């Protein structure tokens, strides 16, 4: 997805800074958010996930923007089943059922991409529920 060497290096540098951050040495999740449409959050999230999968056996990228999903378009995946379905079904231990996986060409590691799933009326309630926290 990263098209040029300078961008690739920038994402690898960002990944390394996150991995070796002494203030938070055991980071297992990262949230990228923006208040402004078109600020590049999806591009950064997707490229950072791809960069992480080169060094880690499994990476899970979740599109939490249920009202305006975009990650499914970036990876050309179906958005019919995803995060909202997993939360509504309380089936979070079987997250892989709601994902599409991609194998990294160089490392054979897996990138799991979870789309938003079906649209729901109570998006904020769903994302602030204890099920999402788990």
Annotate each PLM feature:
Residues 53:
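Gly/Ala-rich phosphate-binding loop of Rossmann-like dinucleotide-binding domains
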């Amino acid at each position: 997805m990263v098209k040029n060497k300078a961008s690739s290096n920038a994402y690898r540098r960002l990944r390394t800074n996150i991995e070796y951050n002494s203030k938070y040495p055991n980071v297992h999740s990262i949230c990228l958010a923006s208040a402004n449409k078109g600020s590049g959050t999806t591009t950064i999230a997707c490229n950072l996930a791809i960069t992480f999968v080169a060094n880690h056996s499994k990476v899970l990228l979740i599109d939490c923007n249920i009202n305006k999903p975009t990650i499914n378009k970036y990876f050309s995946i179906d958005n019919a089943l995803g995060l909202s379905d997993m939360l509504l079904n309380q089936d979070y231990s079987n997250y892989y059922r709601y994902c599409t996986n991609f194998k990294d060409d160089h490392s054979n590691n897996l990138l799991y991409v979870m789309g938003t799933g079906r649209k729901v009326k109570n998006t904020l309630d769903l994302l602030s529920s204890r099920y999402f926290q788990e």
